[in-house]
Amino acid sequence: MKCPYCHHLESKVVDSRYTKEHTSIRRRRECLNCGERFTTYERIEDIPLMVIKRNGQREFFDRNKLLTGIMKSCEKRPIPQEKIEQVVDDIEKELNNKMKQEIASTEIGEMVMERLKDIDEVAYVRFASVYRQFKDVNKFKQELERLLQED
């Protein structure tokens, strides 16, 4: 690590500790040339996740957008807020574990539907009606019949 005082390239670590959030490590270093001490921080570099929309447009993944969409589907349903946030946490964790830089919005939509189906069928159908863009009542009816057959 380059010393900010004399620009020497070698230093030794004299103290290391996690920050309060445990997202980085604070290190106190001592320059081996001039003896001055300085602080550095080490953290994992986050690679932003890009979502590829149906029209091909790309935008940054937005946790709040996902949460809002699921909350609309669950409106006036007996689903605790903690459960909805757990769904978003699970999806976000799964996306991070995929180690991809880009993901299709359709893949995220399928992940949401998979989870909502197990939580509340009405919320599932509401989400599906927007996500699958039902154009008429027959498509909506087919989705309901498919859901009933699985039960």
Swiss-Prot record:
- What does the UniProt cofactor note say? Binds 1 zinc ion.
What positions does the domain ATP-cone occupy?
49-139
| Zinc finger boundaries on the chain: unnamed | 3-34
Q: Which GO terms describe its molecular function?
A: ATP binding; DNA binding; zinc ion binding
Keyword check for ATP-binding: yes
Q: Which cofactor(s) are needed, names only? A: Zn(2+)
One biological process term from GO is: negative regulation of DNA-templated transcription
What this protein is reported to do is described as: Negatively regulates transcription of bacterial ribonucleotide reductase nrd genes and operons by binding to NrdR-boxes.
Would you identify the family this protein belongs to, as annotated? Answer: Belongs to the NrdR family.
Q: What is this protein called?
A: Transcriptional repressor NrdR
In its UniProt entry, the species of origin is given as Halothermothrix orenii (strain H 168 / OCM 544 / DSM 9562)
